[in-house]
């Protein structure tokens, strides 16, 4: 059995997260984006925001406003995703004076609870129940973060 990247098995979520950690610490944005789907994360965040408002909408005008907002968000999504990608790339390439990756520097892929179901995994840093994210396995076998899940 092949072992790599600090004794993590290849083609596992943990291995992809170890590769992502290395890319972030090396300020290697291109490699980091191999393991993070910013477009999908932004789409999921927008979806969740509208779902939250829809669950609280109780008058027709509010429902109409939410529907209009959802349509506008759909039209703006490519520009928003590009802006998010550019900001993430800038953060990765920066000397990290803002402390973006302080948790990554201190962390280890072994402090993650990873529940895999087929080609999907839910990852939860141990001791941080409010922080979860979903990963999907790509065609070539590596895993990519596709959604940040908030309780």
Locate predicted features.
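C-terminal motif of bacterial Sec signal peptides marking the signal peptidase cleavage site
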Residues: 3-6
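Bacterial signal peptide processing site
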Residues: 8-10
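Short, aromatic-enriched amphipathic alpha-helices that serve as compact interaction elements
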Residues: 12-27
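Residues that form generic nucleotide/phosphate-binding pockets
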Residues: 23, 35, 52, 83, ...
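Short, well-ordered alpha-helical segments enriched in acidic and aromatic residues
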Residues: 29-39
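Short, charge-rich amphipathic alpha-helical segments embedded
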Residues: 39-57
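Long, compositionally biased
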Residues: 56-77
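Exposed beta-sheet edge and beta->alpha loop/turn motif
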Residues: 74-151
């Amino acid at each position: 059995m092949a072992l790599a990247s600090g004794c993590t098995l290849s083609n596992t979520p943990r291995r992809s997260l170890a590769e992502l950690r290395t890319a972030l610490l090396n300020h290697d944005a291109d490699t980091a984006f191999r393991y993070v789907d910013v477009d999908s994360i932004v789409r999921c965040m927008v979806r969740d925001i509208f779902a939250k408002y829809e669950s609280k909408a109780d008058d027709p005008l509010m429902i109409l406003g939410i529907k209009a907002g959802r349509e506008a968000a759909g039209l703006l999504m490519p520009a928003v995703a590009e802006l998010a990608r550019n900001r993430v790339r800038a953060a990765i390439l920066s000397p990290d004076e803002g402390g973006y990756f302080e948790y990554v520097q201190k962390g280890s892929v072994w402090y993650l609870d990873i529940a895999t179901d087929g080609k999907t995994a839910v990852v939860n840093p141990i001791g941080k129940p409010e922080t979860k994210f979903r990963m999907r396995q790509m065609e070539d076998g590596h895993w990519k973060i596709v959604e940040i899940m908030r309780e």
